[in-house]
């Protein structure tokens, strides 16, 4: 296990599906139509909801978003407060999702090509925003040169795939996604060469697609290459399991967290504290894991949790549980959408259509998560199961953070705070309401409203020249 890069502890990641974020250089998808039509695609106007088509033809429908457009929205990213961007694949491919790579060393012209990529990287770094790329190394697209040669029985390439008499092995048996034989040395060297190349260009990390399919050893090999380049480069892996046991990478996409939290706020269970505490204790790289609530592979948060007060509870947990919060583009303004492709709708740029109250809530949570020591690296201590309450215990008691999340009716909650340096009479300040609750013998009593939450911070008590924490 390698140390997690230092910048990860302070990060909030923003996920972007490039075709659906923004079209740069003042263009429309109509202006760019030749880029799509000549490669078998179709185009659609911005704002028209995506829909599933027969034969999965929706993967060939393009809206025109590109890397130029992302760079032009840098002020928006800065306003929101995120400091890392994760892009779904950007390499040459004939689909809008680009998980069927044709050439890893070519940025797709549909996204602006190499010039747009270099420009975006420069713009992001000028605002101290990191860039994380999506590495799809479990499989390639059926148009990848290697696979085309293998299909023709070229002996140099046949063993790089899994070919049978009448078919080939592919991801989830999707024929257009032939799986690579990562046990073959030439395949591993090729993958590591791709990883090395973009680290040299300046990207800050990689997200490994289908990390579970790659297996622990390949995850380790890739992270060894990443850390050989720099200990400050980041590797996170897509693994839809309980998060423990994958310490060979810096973290994984914590879908286990997502499932627990959504079940809790939607009333499918009345307690998840034990599960969260166990995962924290057993997952050695928990601080490098992504706290997910939605993504390009799931229904959007506003669809799975339509009641906004309950949705806020999920967001509070996302930003206060150990790990890196990941915000899927548009979730911060209330975009809805079901299963793929509905969850991959275009970003709405008309602010009159935004849920501005939700947007401001996200901004505050992002700012708090990035600056609060307790949330950045504090220990997770479960205080109560019903309603869920926990402490993020930091090195200094005034850096501690206490969180209570109540998806049910109003409750008066009594919490014993397991930090012997939180002094008697210490005020606990609610960062949202401004209310104060005083500690009495290490215990605090807090009313928590229906479908509501508390985020409490200790503050130093001063009476005249007297300071409660003068020697702590």
UniProtKB/Swiss-Prot annotation:
Catalytic activity, as annotated: cyclomaltodextrin + H2O = linear maltodextrin
Pfam families xrefs: Alpha-amylase (PF00128)
SMART domains membership: Aamy
Keyword Hydrolase included in the entry's annotation: yes
Temperature curve summary: Optimum temperature is 85 degrees Celsius with pNP-alpha-D-maltoside as substrate. Remains stable after preincubation for various periods up to 48 hours at temperatures between 50 and 90 degrees Celsius, pH 6.5. The half-life of the enzyme at 95 degrees Celsius is 2 hours.
Catalytic residues in the record: 209, 238
Annotated site, Transition state stabilizer, chain positions: 297
Known regulation of activity: Addition of 1 mM MnCl(2), NiCl(2), CoCl(2), ZnCl(2), CuCl(2), or 0.1 mM HgCl(2) inhibits the enzyme activity to 0-6%. Activity is increased in vitro upon addition of CaCl(2), DTT (relative activity 147%), KCl (180%), or EDTA (180%), as well as after heating of the enzyme. Is not inhibited by acarbose, a potent alpha-amylase and alpha-glucosidase inhibitor; on the contrary, acarbose is degraded quantitatively by AglB, yielding glucose.
Gene Ontology biological process terms from the UniProt entry: carbohydrate metabolic process
EC number(s) given by UniProt: 3.2.1.54
Source taxon at top rank: Bacteria
Name of the protein described by the UniProt record: Cyclomaltodextrinase
Gene name as annotated: aglB
């Amino acid at each position: 296990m390698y140390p997690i890069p230092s910048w990860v502890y302070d990060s909030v990641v923003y996920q972007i599906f490039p075709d659906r974020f923004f079209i740069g250089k003042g263009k429309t998808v109509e202006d760019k139509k030749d880029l799509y039509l000549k490669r078998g695609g179709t185009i659609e106007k911005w704002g028209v909801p995506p829909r599933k088509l027969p034969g999965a033809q929706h993967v060939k429908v393009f809206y025109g978003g590109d890397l130029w457009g992302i760079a032009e929205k840098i002020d928006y990213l800065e306003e929101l407060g995120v400091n890392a961007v994760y892009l779904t694949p950007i390499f040459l491919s004939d689909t809008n999702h680009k998980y069927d790579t044709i050439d890893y060393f070519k940025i797709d012209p549909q996204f602006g090509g190499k010039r747009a990529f270099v420009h975006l990287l420069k713009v992001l770094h000028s605002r101290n925003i990191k860039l994380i790329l999506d590495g799809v190394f479990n499989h390639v697209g059926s148009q990848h040169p290697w696979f085309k040669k293998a299909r023709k029985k070229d002996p140099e390439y046949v063993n790089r795939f899994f070919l049978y008499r009448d078919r080939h092995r592919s991801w989830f048996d999707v024929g257009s996604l032939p799986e690579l034989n990562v046990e073959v040395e030439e395949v591993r060297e090729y993958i590591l060469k791709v990883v090395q190349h973009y680290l040299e260009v300046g990207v800050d990390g990689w997200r490994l697609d289908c990390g579970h399919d790659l297996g622990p050893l390949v995850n380790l090999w890739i992270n060894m290459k990443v850390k050989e380049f720099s200990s400050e480069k980041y590797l996170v892996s897509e693994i839809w399991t309980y998060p423990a046991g994958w310490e060979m990478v810096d973290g994984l996409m914590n879908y286990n967290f997502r499932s627990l939290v959504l079940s809790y706020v939607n009333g499918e269970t009345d307690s998840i504290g034990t599960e969260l505490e166990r995962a924290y204790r057993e997952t050695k790289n928990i601080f490098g894991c992504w706290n997910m609530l939605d993504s390009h592979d799931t229904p959007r948060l506003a669809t799975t949790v339509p009641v906004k007060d309950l949705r806020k509870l999920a967001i509070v947990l996302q930003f206060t549980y150990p790990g890196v919060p990941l915000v899927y583009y548009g979730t911060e303004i209330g975009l809805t959408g079901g299963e793929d492709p509905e969850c991959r709708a275009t970003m709405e740029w008309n602010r009159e259509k935004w849920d501005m109250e939700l947007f401001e809530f996200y901004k505050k949570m992002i700012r708090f998560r990035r600056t609060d020591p307790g949330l950045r690296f504090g220990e997770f201590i479960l205080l109560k199961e019903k309603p869920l309450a926990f402490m993020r215990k930091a090195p200094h008691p005034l850096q501690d953070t206490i969180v209570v999340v109540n998806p049910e009716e109003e409750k008066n909650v009594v919490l014993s705070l397991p930090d012997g340096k939180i002094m008697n009479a210490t005020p606990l300040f609610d960062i949202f309401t401004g209310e104060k609750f005083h500690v009495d013998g290490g215990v605090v009593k807090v009313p928590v409203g229906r479908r509501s939450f508390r985020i409490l911070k200790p503050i130093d008590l001063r009476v005249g020249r007297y300071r409660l924490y003068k020697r702590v």
